[in-house]
Amino acid sequence: MRFGIFINSCVCALVMSVAIAPSAVALRQAQGPSGSLVTPLSIDSAPLVTEPVEESASLPTTVTEPVEGPASLPVTVTEPVEVASSPQLHSTNKARSKTKAQRYVESISRSESLKSSVLGVLALTEGGDTLASWNSGQRMVPASTMKLITTGLAIHRLGPDFKYVTRIGYSGSIKDGILDGDLYIVGGGDPTIASKDSIAIPRAKLFAQWKSFLDKAGIKKINGKVIGDGRYFDGPIEHDTWSYQDIGTAYGAGGNGLCFYENAQDFRVSAGPSVGSPVNVTVSFPNTPWMRYEYPCRTAPAGTGDQLYLFNSEFLPYAEIRGSFAIDRKPKTEEFSNKFGAYTCAHYFCEYLKSNGVPVSEGPADIRLGRVRSNLSSNEYAPYASRVDDLNMLGQTYSPSLKRIARETNLKSDNFYAETLFRTLGRRFHHSASYDSSYVAVNEVMKNIGVSADDVRIVDGSGLARHNYISPSFFVRFLSAMMDSPSFADYIQTIGQPGNRHYESRLKDAPATVKSRVHLKSGSMNGVRCFSGYIEPSTGSKSDTIIFSIMTNNSLAPASRIDPLIDRIITLLAADN
């Protein structure tokens, strides 16, 4: 948004383009047509420092930036910038009364570490004071800071005490202790089943609960299958914009209605005896005897690192581990993805039943395209699976609470949990867990908290996609809106703090009095480093809470050079409050 201020004198006309920072409240409330901000114009004696902003394609655009000149006369230089045809919340330039944080942001924008990079910053108090701003309306790739949005919407809409439900049911009939039919594990989206996460119910305990339902029903033998039913989530298990290399990793596993071990699989790998020899690879857990694996990966020269990638698909039980593993690397456990979570869950519960005196005549199966599939290598399908509503339910178990799942999502930056939350919103509020439906549901929940997402693009819940485009100003107004949510006290507890678990190295030079007031979430991928969050006020006044978003994109510098710059911004912001 640009306001032209014309100051006429008898000597000359000076034209200045000024973009004024919207407050945290104005970012949410003062919106005009097409999501543009309507901000009251004010002029004071503070120096004007401006930066590039996007404009409507129909308008001529100029940018003013400071140059050296006489102290008594502000001097500006105008130059053309590219314009955008789509409306967006436009970047505030600098705070009208410069803070230390603002001055530091301006200085690092010209640093070698951020050379030819995109830097976006916005920090406001909830009361409306702008503490730092730079390219705040620039849409950028958020990486894992996207999880702040996903967890916030889930906690707000589903409630912090929401729990996923997994049900055990059967088709057919029970007579003389024999189930003449199939046993169903009906997934409800619980992402923690058999997870190694500390919040998850241990697998043996969970399976014992499931078996107790059979015991109460008098089932001692199953003449049929144990079917893993993941139909609660429809559609592909990963987003179609994810990198093919990513979807083979554990962090790109993707979620479904019934999962197992976060749909991950561990492999033990070690270098071969010489450069060029095969890498030694063995499946660790879970064991998937129906899978066929090939390992066309080779031992590489010392210093080349770990370049192993698994390529797999949910359509066929075949996978390859390609790439290389340096000869000087120590043996390690690689975490890759398992595209058959529901089948794996059925397999392991089937084995549990057999080892505890309940034979299963036809073994495990899952459901694909509505049909029972017992042999993943065959194109042959059994008849259609029973409808869930037609099953006889024996019992149900519950996941940990949503606030605990959301906390692990943000602290561990768990993509699997984040995607599950994202798709749960679609399933619960738009009748489908497909990514398209989930996106619609997310937009609806966003409007419910008073935030428009018209000026950003959201395609997944974890931030793994490079097709997410979020601006610092959007993060700030979203985080500001969350402060008014009845679930905010639970939400802020999901966000990490410097010095605590997973953030031990953040703000390491800052005093403890500063660290204890900062809540932040990081996001990183190649060329991307972002941090967003809150700084609690030393005054204890809600209006003094600082909401910040600091984003860098297209950087060639390593995180070890970018992070200290971001840490310094956050420390200076906290010092001002």
Predicted regions mapped to residue ranges:
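A short, well-structured edge-of-sheet supersecondary motif
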Residues: S109-W134, A365
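Conserved serine DD-peptidase/penicillin-binding transpeptidase domain
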Residues: L89-R110, H156-A453, K542, A575-D576
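Short active-site loop at a secondary-structure junction
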Residues: S133-I149, L153
